[in-house]
Amino acid sequence: MMNAETALLLSRQSTDDSFREYHCSAGLIFLAFAVEAMFIFYRRQVDSDYDKRGDKACRKDFHKKTLELYGIKNYLGRRDYQIVKTCLDARDSIAHGDFFISNFEFTPTVADDHNIFSGEILTQSSEQFRNITLRMLEEGINAAKRIDEYIYDNGYKVDENIDSEFMPKLQLAFGVSGMYTW
């Protein structure tokens, strides 16, 4: 999540459109990684035997099952999840090499130099990158943090024979520094 937030700050500071677009795209990719890691982190808190490599479930089913394991039902339709899903889908369109046809206006600046034409055309963003905006990244980061907090506030290990109010709290995914005190 820290990389996504850094990319957000860099894109806000950028005065050049291509740098802003680059940082937004990089931030969105890191956001998607963070969200996937968050769900795996929570899954392992309630299912210590969970093996990511052996899990062939699609993302939607994995997220739904993981949420159900800590007592949260019908969350995938909520606004925050839908915002994050949009970010995940955008990342997938980049990462999986989805085919896009991009149209844009092009007026040659020099009459005879084909090399310059090529450079100008190749610097145009393809469709999947044009759809990534600063707002999309910012909303995605905020939505992911709210999902993390919601799971932390409302989630518990369902299979224990203890009332939910007395269940031990799950650890925040985005609040973990990577260090653990023994």
Region spans (language model):
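A generic secondary-structure boundary signal that marks alpha-helix termini
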Residues: 13, 36, 43-44, 149, ...
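Amphipathic, well-ordered alpha-helical segments in soluble domains
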Residues: 3-10, 30, 37, 90, ...
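Short non-catalytic regulatory patches outside canonical folded cores
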Residues: 36-89, 96-97
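Short regulatory "switch" loops immediately downstream of catalytic or recognition motifs
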Residues: 7-13, 45-48, 98-107
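Charge-enriched, short contiguous segments at helix-coil
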Residues: 74-86, 90-171, 181-182
